[in-house]
């Protein structure tokens, strides 16, 4: 029985990781509003090494269409601008001598559809991850030295777990798509 619980717990952990990864990936997909997470991939040259932007500056959103970046050291302003340009996010940073300001342009309908497709692809990847965890759990259950009744009920449990996680992925995707398509 312990072996079965271990297999189920392992499958659940893997599925949870797929959900976590999906959320992280979706947070990088930009919806209409400005958010500090949009700059999560920006690296800045800081004393000779590449450093994440969040470690060298505060990123704020004064309003829904603007990102304000306050560097901890004013000498970093040009490096921050360069980092944003190199990250290829489609932003045009401006500096006022003390901070870097980014006006986030509104998304076009075509771009919204592209982002929606990207979100669907990420969700599908997460579903594949969940299904792979199910497959692995099923194989391990078959290898386990357990009765047929226990095997059947355990397989049903794994399938139920899989269905639950697939539903969660669909809900997360629906929320993100709504966020993307909202003008």
From Swiss-Prot:
PANTHER family: MITOCHONDRIAL RIBOSOME RECYCLING FACTOR PSEUDO 1, RIBOSOME RECYCLING FACTOR. HAMAP family: RRF. One of its GO terms (biological process) is translational termination. This is Ribosome-recycling factor. Belongs to the RRF family. Keywords: Cytoplasm, Protein biosynthesis. It is found in: Cytoplasm. Responsible for the release of ribosomes from messenger RNA at the termination of protein biosynthesis. May increase the efficiency of translation by recycling ribosomes from one round of translation to another. Signal peptide: none annotated. Its main location: cytoplasm. Pfam families: RRF. One of its GO terms (molecular function) is ribosomal large subunit binding. CDD domains: RRF (cd00520). One of its GO terms (cellular component) is cytoplasm.
């Amino acid at each position: 029985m312990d072996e079965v619980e271990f297999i189920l717990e392992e499958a659940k952990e893997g599925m949870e990781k797929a959900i976590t990864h999906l959320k992280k990936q979706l947070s990088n997909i930009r919806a209409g509003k400005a958010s500090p997470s949009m700059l999560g991939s920006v690296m800045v040259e800081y004393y000779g090494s590449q450093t994440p932007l969040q470690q060298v500056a505060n990123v704020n959103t004064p309003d829904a269409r603007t990102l304000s970046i306050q560097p901890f050291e004013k000498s970093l302003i040009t490096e921050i601008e360069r980092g944003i340009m190199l990250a290829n996010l489609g932003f045009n940073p401006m500096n006022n001598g003390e901070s870097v300001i980014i006006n986030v342009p509104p998304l076009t309908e075509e771009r919204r559809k592209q982002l929606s497709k990207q979100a669907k692809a990420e969700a599908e990847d997460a579903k594949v991850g969940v299904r792979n965890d199910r497959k692995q759990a099923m194989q391990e259950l078959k290898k386990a030295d357990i009765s047929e009744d226990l095997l059947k009920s355990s397989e049903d449990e794994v399938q139920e777990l899989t269905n639950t996680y697939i539903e969660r992925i669909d809900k997360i995707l629906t929320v993100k798509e709504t966020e993307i398509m909202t003008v």
